[in-house]
Amino acid sequence: MSSVRAEILPVDFPNTAAARITIDAPASVIFDLLASPAAHQRFDGSGSVRNAISGPDRLFLGATFGMAMKIKVPYRIKNTVVEFEENKKITWCHLMKWTWSYELQAVAPNKTIVTESFDASKISGFAKWWLNRTGAMDHNPKWMAKSLVALKAICEG
């Protein structure tokens, strides 16, 4: 599995990033992990997700969930699910209004293309400062690719 890589995708807008991978598993298996906040730390490629601290076991449209995080310093963040299409797409955002999305495209019964995207193109003020201060935009594409490789390992393992 160490030679497996996700594809970092070109993006058209500043403060956005995207990566894609093909996983040999049904979309439902992958989506179940994405919709479970308690599972997020298992496939986080950034090392910033510590654990889920509040929210439902399984996400749904409008659900809120809290995560313990660490980027330079420990903090907690509350996320809200803003898009949810079972086994196809899930998107959440938090106070700074950038979004994390996962889109799943089943290409065969046991083969799914997963695209992870980050969109901070519409943020301003403190949120822009935070992204610059943490270096997130420099690191996000690589971290997203690592997350997708970890997600693939879990789903195919």
At which residue positions do the language-model features occur?
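Beta-strand/loop substructures that line and gate deep hydrophobic ligand-binding cavities in soluble
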Residues: 93-146, 151
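Intrinsic-disorder/low-complexity, polar/charged segments enriched in Ser/Thr/Lys/Arg/Asp/Glu/Gln
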Residues: 16-22, 64, 76, 89, ...
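Short beta-edge strand/loop motif at the mouth of beta-sheet-based domains
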Residues: 18, 38-77, 84-87
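Short, highly charged C-terminal tails/helix-capping segments
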Residues: 50, 150-157
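Hydrophobic pocket/interface hotspot
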Residues: 29-34, 40, 65-67, 81, ...
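Hydrophobic ligand-binding cavity/cleft-lining segments
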Residues: 1-55
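Beta-strand elements of well-folded, non-transmembrane domains
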Residues: 25, 71-73, 120-122
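A short, structured loop/turn motif at beta-sheet edges
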Residues: 24-28, 57, 83-87, 103-113
